């Protein structure tokens, strides 16, 4: 490709409303153009990157035995009503009526459609297992689309669905997809982690997320370098302290703490470390039968509540945070001074994190404005609480596998695999006849990759002050040739054209910058758009038979013999 024949424009500055690095870089580099909030046009340069990601995903899925199909973006409401998700989904499900007043949705996902396809045609265990996937545009009407292609309303996704006659066979395919996803992200050239994850609203049992590591990532990943253990912080178990609870060494006392409501302020006022403070989080659970449970969740002052873990406490599932009025009604004061001491156990349930259950001589709210209790001990000053793991792990915690300490990494979720089991198959009556002729519900797996999201995540991982740094496998071009004086020097033009032809002949994805621009402009553009390898051809070097080579991450260029440049580039690209 020659730049004179290519349609791309670059910007010196990113638009003011661009929020994250990838969004800024993609707009500046001309990868995308904003059409509306959360909706983008993929320009030729960005589309080259997107298609390279898509092709790697497709190759590996095909190699793994999955079959590609293409389902409709527009789905009939009847399928969503049959599965129960018509009511469960919120406003992010874009619904509309056609001219005949029939209801449809723009698909944010395709569990209903694929299950309908399979239930129509698969009747016998002899037709199972089957794994079908597509790469298709989806739409979710996000309330606040942000971060460019990272959280847009329209996005390109690979979603695959497998159907099985047994759970054991589902687990086999799940392992196959785990390995396939690992190969995909390795081929893409990305630093990533596969982590155990919560299944969330999609349901099912086992689940793993695949995260591209980046400091700007939205998700926290707990990782043990000694063992390779990895899990989303939402799921990682916080182990109970090994040491026994220390004996009480002081009496409980009510202490005046005027205006000190936050744990950090209380700790500073009392001149105590934050891990000596117990914070009480008031929650309310309302059951379908109309019963209510008001509860205090106790955590150490330096720990954060893990809502997913807390929601697994049966007595308060589901729960919401209590209102100020509800707190005052049951505890007699506003949040900030509430605690588990001297409460009516018939009105207030208490659940403590493992770390709190191990504390002695701690500080908590006194249920009186402006006061906290100090020197509090379980068993003496208040009953022993029910104990659960309800906090997020932190760096330095023991790894749940017992083989080291946890580190916390930041990641961007780009893939997710689920063992759905029978949730959708049962709702949509997706059944088969087993070898005895008995009707059985199929087991399902679900496997998603955010294809367009990968592009944004790769840029979040690879960038500097000059622009985008992409792995060669997904860069818009592998090599750029920048001739100095292409339109003025016949020698430069001839050498550039010859190198361009030689590289194209051996299959290198190369771009020749034949614009009549200043060298500084060409250098800046090629660095901004993220081309891994650059060859500069000038009259001075040609006199000595030399080209200038520089990789995107090199600090300084090196001079390479004109006769060696193709071999050098081949070696660099093969090693990538």
Swiss-Prot record:
Domain of life: Bacteria
Top EC class for this record: ligase
Gene3D superfamilies: Anticodon-binding domain, Bira Bifunctional Protein, Domain 2, YbaK/aminoacyl-tRNA synthetase-associated domain
GO biological process: prolyl-tRNA aminoacylation
Main location: cytoplasm
InterPro entries: aa-tRNA-synt_IIb (IPR002314), aa-tRNA-synth_II (IPR006195), aa-tRNA-synth_II/BPL/LPL (IPR045864), Anticodon-bd (IPR004154), Anticodon-bd_dom_sf (IPR036621), Pro-tRNA-ligase_IIa (IPR002316), Pro-tRNA-synth_IIa_bac-type (IPR004500), Pro-tRNA-Synthase_IIa_type1 (IPR023717)
Molecular function GO terms recorded: aminoacyl-tRNA deacylase activity; ATP binding; proline-tRNA ligase activity
The reaction(s) this protein catalyses: tRNA(Pro) + L-proline + ATP = L-prolyl-tRNA(Pro) + AMP + diphosphate
Pfam families: HGTP_anticodon, tRNA-synt_2b, tRNA_edit
Enzyme Commission numbers on file: 6.1.1.15
Keywords: Aminoacyl-tRNA synthetase, ATP-binding, Cytoplasm, Ligase, Nucleotide-binding, Protein biosynthesis
Subcellular location(s) of the protein: Cytoplasm
UniProt xrefs under HAMAP family: Pro_tRNA_synth_type1 (MF_01569)
Function statement: Catalyzes the attachment of proline to tRNA(Pro) in a two-step reaction: proline is first activated by ATP to form Pro-AMP and then transferred to the acceptor end of tRNA(Pro). As ProRS can inadvertently accommodate and process non-cognate amino acids such as alanine and cysteine, to avoid such errors it has two additional distinct editing activities against alanine. One activity is designated as 'pretransfer' editing and involves the tRNA(Pro)-independent hydrolysis of activated Ala-AMP.
Domain remark text: Consists of three domains: the N-terminal catalytic domain, the editing domain and the C-terminal anticodon-binding domain.
Protein family membership: Belongs to the class-II aminoacyl-tRNA synthetase family. ProS type 1 subfamily.
Subunit structure: Homodimer.
Protein name as it appears in the record: Proline--tRNA ligase
Organism: Dechloromonas aromatica (strain RCB)
């Amino acid at each position: 490709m020659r730049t004179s024949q290519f349609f791309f424009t670059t910007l010196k500055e990113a638009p003011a409303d661009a929020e994250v690095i990838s969004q800024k870089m993609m707009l500046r580099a001309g990868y995308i153009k904003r059409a509306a909030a959360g909706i983008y046009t993929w320009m030729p340069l960005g589309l080259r990157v997107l298609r390279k990601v898509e092709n790697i995903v497709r190759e590996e899925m095909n190699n793994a035995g999955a079959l590609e199909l293409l389902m409709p973006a527009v789905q009939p409401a009847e399928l969503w009503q049959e599965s129960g998700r018509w009511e469960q989904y919120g406003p992010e499900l874009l619904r509309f009526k056609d001219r005949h007043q029939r209801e449809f949705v723009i698909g944010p996902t395709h569990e209903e459609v694929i299950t309908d396809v399979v239930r129509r045609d698969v009747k016998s265990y002899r037709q199972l297992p089957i794994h079908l996937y597509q790469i298709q545009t989806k739409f979710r009407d996000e309330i606040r689309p942000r971060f460019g292609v990272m959280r847009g309303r329209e996005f390109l996704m690979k979603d695959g669905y497998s159907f099985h006659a047994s759970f054991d066979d589902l687990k086999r395919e799940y392992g196959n997809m785990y390995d396939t996803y690992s190969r995909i992200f390795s081929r893409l050239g990305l630093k990533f982690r596969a982590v155990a994850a919560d299944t969330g609203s999609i349901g099912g049992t086992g689940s793993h997320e695949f995260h591209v590591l980046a400091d700007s990532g939205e998700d926290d990943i707990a990782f043990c370098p000694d063992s390779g253990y990895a899990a989303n912080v939402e799921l990682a178990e916080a182990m109970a302290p090994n040491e026994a609870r220390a004996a009480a060494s002081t009496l409980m006392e009510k202490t005046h703490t005027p205006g000190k409501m936050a744990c950090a302020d209380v700790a500073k006022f009392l001149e105590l470390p934050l891990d000596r403070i117990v914070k009480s989080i008031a929650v309310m659970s309302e059951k379908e039968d109309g019963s209510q449970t008001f509860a205090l969740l106790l955590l150490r002052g330096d720990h954060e509540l893990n809502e997913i873990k807390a929601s697994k406490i049966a007595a308060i599932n589901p729960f919401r945070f209590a209102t100020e009025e509800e707190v005052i009604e049951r505890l007699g004061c506003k949040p900030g001074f509430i605690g588990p001491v001297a409460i009516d156990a018939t009105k207030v349930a208490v659940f403590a994190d493992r770390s709190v259950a191990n504390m002695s001589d701690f500080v908590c709210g006194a249920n009186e404005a402006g006061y906290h209790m100090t020197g509090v001990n379980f068993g003496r000053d208040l009953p022993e609480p029910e104990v659960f793991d309800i906090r997020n792990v932190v760096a330095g915690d023991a790894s749940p596998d017992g083989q080291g300490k946890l580190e916390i990494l930041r990641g961007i979720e780009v893939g997710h695999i689920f063992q759905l089991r029978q949730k959708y198959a049962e709702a949509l009556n997706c059944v088969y006849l087993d070898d005895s002729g008995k009707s059985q519900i199929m087991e399902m797996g679900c496997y998603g990759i955010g294809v367009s999201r990968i592009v944004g995540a790769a840029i979040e991982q690879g960038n500097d002050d000059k622009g985008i740094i992409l792995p060669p496998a997904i860069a818009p071009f592998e090599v750029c040739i920048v001739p100095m004086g292409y339109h003025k020097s016949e020698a430069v033009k001839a050498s550039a054209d010859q190198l361009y032809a030689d590289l194209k002949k051996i299959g290198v994805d190369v771009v020749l910058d034949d614009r009549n621009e200043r060298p500084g402009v060409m250098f800046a553009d090629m660095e901004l758009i993220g081309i891994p390898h650059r060859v500069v051809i000038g009259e001075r070097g040609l006199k000595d038979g030399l080209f200038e080579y520089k990789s995107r991450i090199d600090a300084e260029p090196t001079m390479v013999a004109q006769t060696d440049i193709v071999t050098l580039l081949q070696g660099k690209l093969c090693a990538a």
